[in-house]
Structures are given as structure tokens and as C-alpha cells.
Amino acid sequence: MMKPHNLFQFLAVCSLTVAVASAQAGAVDALKQFNNDADGISGSFTQTVQSKKKTQTAHGTFKILRPGLFKWEYTLPYRQTIVGDGQTVWLYDVDLAQVTKSSQDQAIGGSPAAILSNKTALESSYTLKEDGSSNGIDYVRATPKRNNAGYQYIRIGFKGGNLAAMQLKDSFGNQTSISFGGLNTNPQLSRGAFKFTPPKGVDVLSN
């Protein structure tokens, strides 16, 4: 399992790129267009984290409402919920009966994930280019312009005009891959869906 801080940043970056990327054709122009048009998205995901020592796979669902709101719920092999409500990022580990909360600005404000709340920052924060095809999936590579972003690049893949996959390679060479399913690019979401109240009896820690 990722450490909470890394998980916060990764999921926030994912929230950005999913919201930006899941429109139609897998072209850079589609990314730019959807960045201007998209406000919300929901669906399911399978996440695989590959390091030199081991591979970890997890499954769950997600929802995003721009600006700045996201919720990722892991269901297998562990139960964990990560909610960004615009001010606080909450990580609830069901099995540990523990909640960790962090300032959203501190948790993700120093990363390109901050452009969740700024639709104009896509091109200023990333260099975008077509990145070939594999297994019928067309990829766009988004390389952060900041040297200290914490990851090397994000690859966003489309199949049949729909978002199919995303890959993120960090500065240590570890790769996180996500495949998406059941996408709804026009979900009926309210800000209330991203409010989180720690359940009674759990330990609440602050970062």
C-alpha cells in the first residue's frame, strides 16, 4: 500500500488527468477541449503498482467534481476511502479503524494536482505529445514541466474514443497503472457527495 502522502498526491493527480482526459478521441486536442468542458466524471478502476520488489493490485470506484473535489473508494483487497473536499483530504482505512486528515493545499498544493481548480493550467504545467499505440490503445504523454514534480510522466490512453488506461512513472522508476470501466462523463454529482465525517470510534490523526 502506498504511504498516505504519496497516495494523496497520486490520487489527486489522477483526479486531474481523469477529469481532463476522458472525453473522446485520444488526441492532444481532445485533452485540451475536455479540460475546458468537463466538470465531473465517475466510474470504476483497477490499479496496479509495480516496484522492483513487488506488484500490488487494487480495485474500486471513483468520482470527481471540479473544481477540487474527488473521492476514491478502494474495495479490494482492502477497504479504504480518500476524499478531497476542497479544504481537507481525508484517508479512511476501514480495517485499521483510522482516519488521517491533511490540509488539501499541503497534501497536493505543491504538485501539479493543484490544477484541479484551475482549468487554464494544463498546458502551463505539462508538455503534451502523442505517445504511440499499444494493444489498441492510443496514448498521450503528459510530462510535468517542473523538475521536482515527484514523477516523470503520465500516459493517458484511449480506446475507441473512450478513456481506457493511465500510467504514472515516479522518480524512483515505480509505475502505477490504472484501467478504467463504467465511465460516466456527465454524472449528477453534488458537492455534498464529497463531505466526509469520521465514523464514531475511529482514531483521527492529523498530518
From Swiss-Prot:
Keyword set, alphabetical order: Chaperone, Periplasm, Protein transport, Signal, Transport
Record's signal peptide: 1-23
GO BP terms in the entry: lipoprotein localization to outer membrane; lipoprotein transport
The organism's place on the tree of life at top rank: Bacteria
GO cellular component, one term: periplasmic space
HAMAP family hit by this protein: LolA
Name of protein: Outer-membrane lipoprotein carrier protein
Organism annotation: Neisseria gonorrhoeae (strain ATCC 700825 / FA 1090)
